[in-house]
């Protein structure tokens, strides 16, 4: 009788360990969108990378000195270019449409190009020294200059909690 009880306890403990391991593996492999500074590995944003999640980065273009807004969408654990919005043609901005792209105008008269077939992982920006880069995610506007500093090398990446730990992202 004592042997049977001991086997039952061992079996129960093993089941708990196996269940905990399965939950941990599931959690550790779930995709997350992270934003960090590559020079310091300081992580500022960690958000579940669910399909349809959108974010944008808006800045003043360094050459033509007008606002540009790049919008991205998460699809199939990838960061995909969704649209680019800008006010005027000029050096450094797209002047012709590629196959599958369309251009419309928003309510403010800005040009909006959609239909991109470009994915990034990682997506990189260098925060401006003169003008800021504004991240919009979950209807929140975040100054990347205030958050990360001027000239910060910002990286957006789809990764897992396990990879976050192994890369040393603080």
Task: Label each region the model flagged.
Residues 56-96:
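Extracytoplasmic/periplasmic/luminal assembly and interaction segments
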Residues 22-39:
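Aromatic-capped interface at the extracytoplasmic side
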Residues 10-27:
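Hydrophobic membrane-insertion alpha-helices, especially the h-region
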Residues 37-39, 59-61, 158-160:
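Short, structured patches in soluble enzyme cores that scaffold and shape functional sites
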Residues 93-170:
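Mature, soluble, non-transmembrane domains
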